[in-house]
């Protein structure tokens, strides 16, 4: 096959080009590369192929097209610079509108302008006066959060006070704590010993003759003391009659039941 030199051939292979093979560089075989796919700039061609492609291996039409495109670009630039500026491109932008408070105040009515001036003066006075004054942080909270936080702060303050009192009066607090522990132990002991004491008291009541309600016959005989009295015969007869009448009444009542 003949080497294509400057002819208008759309596709060809690397081994058809006049690439020197003396330096041991093997051409890429059997890869079809279109000339239009190559970069248009000669420098980029040289970088891409490392000076292995000569001008003779590239068609003259493509180089002519490159030159024409460059010249047309330059002409377009010149015509744009010299053409009348009717479109947006090439126009000088107008300066942005000065949106300031003065312009806004000019559109406001006089009453609002006076108010804004007074407010501005007050703000300036406050800023100048607060330059050297201490910063006061306002810790006011919203009413919805006030109850919970107030309770928490109260609890914290109480805990702090208790801790401070304990630190300041260490010995009295220890004494109070010991007294409280002693009283607690005594109460527990009494609660535990109540049942045992109750059982022991019952045993003592059963054993002791002085506290027992059921007395024996000997005790009754010894405890009863007969006192002799001098009654007349008439009194004795009246006594016996009264006893007999009481017995008859008791029997009659018993029979009625």
UniProtKB/Swiss-Prot annotation:
Say if the entry is tagged with keyword Iron-sulfur: no
Q: What is this protein called?
A: Uncharacterized protein DP238L
* Compositional bias per record (Acidic residues), positions renumbered to this chain: 216-236
Please give the coiled-coil regions recorded for this protein: none
Q: What induces it?
A: Expressed in the early phase of the viral replicative cycle.
Q: Which UniProt keywords apply?
A: Early protein
Q: Where is this region: Disordered?
A: 74-115, 209-257
Per the record, where are the segments of Polar residues compositional bias? 100-113
- Family according to the record: Belongs to the asfivirus DP238L family.
Composition skew (Basic and acidic residues), residue ranges: 74-83
């Amino acid at each position: 096959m003949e080497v294509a030199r400057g002819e208008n051939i759309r596709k060809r292979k690397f081994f058809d080009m006049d690439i020197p093979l003396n330096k041991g560089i093997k051409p890429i075989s059997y890869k079809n590369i279109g000339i239009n796919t190559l970069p248009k700039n000669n420098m980029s061609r040289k970088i891409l192929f490392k000076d292995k492609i000569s001008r003779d291996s590239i068609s003259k039409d493509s180089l002519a097209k490159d030159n024409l495109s460059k010249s047309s670009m330059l002409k377009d630039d010149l015509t744009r610079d010299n053409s009348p500026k009717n479109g947006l491109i090439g126009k000088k932008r107008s300066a942005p509108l000065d949106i300031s408070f003065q312009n806004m105040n000019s559109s406001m009515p006089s009453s609002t302008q006076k108010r804004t001036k007074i407010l501005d003066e007050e703000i300036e006075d406050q800023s100048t006066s607060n330059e050297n004054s201490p910063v006061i942080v306002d810790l006011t909270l919203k009413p919805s959060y006030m109850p919970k936080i107030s309770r928490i702060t109260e609890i914290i303050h109480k805990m702090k006070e208790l801790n401070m009192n304990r630190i300041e009066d260490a010995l009295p607090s220890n004494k109070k704590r010991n007294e409280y522990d002693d009283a607690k132990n005594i109460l527990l002991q009494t609660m535990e010993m109540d049942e045992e004491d109750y059982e022991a008291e019952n045993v003592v009541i059963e054993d002791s003759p002085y506290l027992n309600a059921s007395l024996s016959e000997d005790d009754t005989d010894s405890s009863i003391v007969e006192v002799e009295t001098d009654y007349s015969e008439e009194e004795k007869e009246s006594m016996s009659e009264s006893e007999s009448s009481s017995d008859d009444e008791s029997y009659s009542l018993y029979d009625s039941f």
